[in-house]
């Protein structure tokens, strides 16, 4: 049998298996990404996925980028190994169209080419859960949320004094240490988390063994909280990420150079937030203030300096009446960025004052309606109004069967980098997205979503031969994204076996000119089988199939289109307690040593193994 035929045959077997005896009651999941307040995942019409700390540990994910690429509707491409430049596409849309948050603090870096977050620099050691809300969310969050929101929630302290320590070692001389210690009583909470992850790596550019491109990531997170009384509480949150990465640049002939032993970059990102909460009966007030400071320096044939600062303030008023909720929010954002290339500095900045109103109505015990409206007043761009209308219906005649739909509008303001390199005397304007999704799901067993999104006034770039730099501008025309997501989980609790799978098909991922976007796979299949014992041992096998995917080969003139897809990766996982409060995790990745290039010309991880010993107290 053809190997790809065998792999694709897993789709019907894993996606559509049903067994009425396999009904398992799961613990409720609480999220904050849908409307900025805590709620059950059942209390929103939005399409939400949650990756838990348990799943991260079981799969051995080292970064957020690695964790989300196994979610339906999301694809990720890496330009090399750990810490190398990474792009992620939610439903085919660009990285800068997804808002990334850490405990509510904005991580999107305005100094990047799209205003995107560096998911490759977000390690998983301190994560409690990752919330992913797909579809336009600008009617709540404003800019950079037209594809969705990824909110990373870090660990919270338990009662008394608790902590953990973990050490990792693996292929490519990868080593890591992470630790946390926390305290909690009736009034005070404190949690300090720190991690270091290093690797000697492999060549970012093919061939993989040309030389080593290393990476170092240092992360510290501090959370403090004080509860004055049952109604009033204050929280402080600080996060810092410092990285150093070696990469491969271009030679004198403008070709990728796998033997480049000079090009490197470092970054220093600091986020600080203060939150005050007041709650009495059915009313809650949230005050939020945060700052983000982003510094990046790239050293290759020239020196590039990137600087950005974000100041954000918000006030939320939440009113609960019965099973319904109304939220009135006010926001103020100040975004400022500088881009310097060989001593030539350019600037981009703007102010945004926003107001939004969100309502959830439980019409009866089976039908939920959610409406959002937001208005943003800019000092630099044309003001924007966005909205969302959603409905979800539970079918009592078939318990566990839910249908729903959402229609939304969204926008993405230019990043400070895009503003800095725009055409002279030309004012960029935000891109505008509108779209809808329709979904049906039956318990865990089957979840089907169809989506259709269109973006106008997208950003594009031309190369200026005089300055050897890109110029950003708005384009006329409409980009189109249509696709289907199918996912399923099937449990055999008596045997301790869990089957999971998801499949994504993109019908359209077209640019404004009708051509297809590069680096998006038309088909993606993720499948896994996991086995659990009563002694908390876990072992599993995981596979990912990437279908047709295209990229460009710039090694000759004119550049030509190349195929980079049609391959399957297999991974093995093992987790078990080895002593009291001590666990061992072993993860074997790409076990058949498949050679592939997610980004044409760049290498990918070969057969590799990693082990982690963790202790908690």
Spans of features found by a protein language model:
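N-terminal periplasmic accessory domains that precede
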Residues: 64-67, 86-89, 98-101, 117-122, ...
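Gram-negative outer-membrane beta-barrel transporters
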Residues: 360-369, 475-555, 580-584, 592, ...
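N-terminal periplasmic "start-of-domain" segments of outer-membrane beta-barrel proteins
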Residues: 28-57
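Outer-membrane beta-barrel signature, preferentially recognizing the C-terminal barrel domain
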Residues: 23, 254-279, 306-309, 395-398, ...
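Structural signature of Gram-negative outer-membrane beta-barrels, strongest in the C-terminal barrel
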Residues: 227-231, 239, 323, 327, ...
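Outer-membrane beta-barrel "beta-signal"
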Residues: 439-441, 605-617
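Short acidic/polar hinge/loop motifs at secondary-structure boundaries
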Residues: 106-134
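Periplasmic-side early beta-strands and strand-to-turn transitions of outer-membrane beta-barrels
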Residues: 139, 151, 158-160, 168, ...
């Amino acid at each position: 049998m053809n190997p790809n035929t065998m792999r694709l045959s897993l789709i019907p077997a894993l996606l559509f298996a049903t067994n009425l005896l396999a009904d398992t009651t799961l613990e409720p999941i609480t999220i904050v990404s849908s409307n900025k307040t805590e709620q059950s995942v059942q209390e929103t019409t939005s399409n939400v996925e949650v990756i838990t700390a348990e799943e991260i540990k079981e799969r051995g994910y080292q970064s957020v980028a690695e964790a989300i690429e196994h979610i339906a509707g999301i694809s990720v491409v890496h330009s090399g190994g750990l810490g190398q430049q990474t792009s992620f596409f939610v439903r085919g849309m660009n990285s800068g169209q997804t808002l990334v948050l850490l405990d509510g603090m904005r991580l999107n870096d305005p100094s990047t080419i799209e205003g995107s977050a560096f998911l490759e620099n977000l390690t998983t050691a301190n994560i409690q859960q990752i919330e992913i809300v797909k579809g336009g969310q600008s009617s709540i969050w404003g800019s950079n949320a037209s594809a969705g929101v990824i909110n990373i929630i870090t660990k919270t302290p338990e009662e008394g004094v608790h902590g953990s320590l973990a050490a990792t070692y693996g292929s490519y001389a990868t080593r890591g240490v992470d630790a946390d210690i926390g305290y909690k009583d009736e009034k005070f909470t404190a949690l300090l988390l720190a991690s270091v992850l290093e690797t000697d790596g492999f060549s970012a550019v093919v061939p993989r063994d040309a030389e080593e491109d290393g990476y170092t990531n240092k992360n510290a997170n501090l959370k403090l909280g004080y509860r004055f009384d049952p109604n009033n509480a204050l929280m402080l949150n600080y996060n810092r990420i410092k990285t150093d990465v070696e990469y491969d640049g271009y030679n004198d002939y403008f070709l990728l150079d796998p033997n480049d032993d000079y090009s490197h970059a470092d970054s220093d990102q600091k986020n600080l937030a203060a939150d005050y909460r007041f709650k009495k009966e059915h009313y809650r007030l949230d005050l939020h203030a945060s700052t983000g400071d982003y510094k990046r320096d790239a050293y290759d044939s020239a020196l590039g300096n990137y600087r950005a600062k974000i100041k954000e303030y918000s006030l939320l008023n939440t009113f609960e009446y019965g099973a319904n909720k109304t939220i009135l929010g006010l926001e103020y954002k100040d975004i400022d960025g500088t881009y310097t290339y060989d001593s030539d500095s350019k600037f981009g900045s703007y102010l945004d004052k926003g107001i939004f109103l969100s309502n959830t109505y439980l019409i009866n015990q089976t039908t939920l309606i959610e409406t959002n409206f937001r208005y943003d007043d800019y000092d630099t761009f044309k003001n924007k109004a966005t909205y969302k209308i959603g409905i979800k219906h539970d079918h009592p005649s078939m318990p566990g069967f839910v249908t729903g739909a959402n229609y939304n509008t969204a926008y993405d303001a230019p990043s400070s980098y895009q503003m800095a390199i725009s055409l002279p005397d030309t004012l960029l304007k935000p891109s505008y997205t509108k779209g809808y999704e329709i979904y049906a799901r039956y318990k865990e067993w089957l979840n089907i979503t169809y989506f259709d999104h269109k973006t106008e006034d997208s950003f594009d770039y031309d190369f200026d031969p005089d300055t050897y730099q890109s110029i950003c501008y708005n384009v006329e025309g409409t980009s189109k994204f249509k696709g289907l997501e199918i996912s399923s989980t099937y449990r055999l609790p008596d045997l301790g076996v869990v089957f999971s799978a998801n499949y994504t098909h993109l019908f359209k991922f077209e640019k404004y000119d009708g051509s297809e976007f590069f680096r998006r796979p038309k088909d993606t299949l993720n499948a896994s089988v996991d086995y659990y014992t009563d002694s908390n041992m876990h072992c599993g096998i995981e596979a990912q199939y990437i279908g047709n995917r295209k990229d460009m080969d710039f090694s000759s003139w004119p550049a030509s289109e190349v195929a980079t897809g049609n391959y399957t990766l297999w991974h093995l996982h093992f987790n078990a307690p080895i002593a009291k409060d001590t666990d061992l995790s072993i993860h074997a990745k790409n076990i058949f040593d498949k050679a592939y290039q997610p980004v044409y010309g760049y290498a990918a991880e070969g057969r590799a193994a990693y082990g982690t010993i963790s202790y908690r107290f």
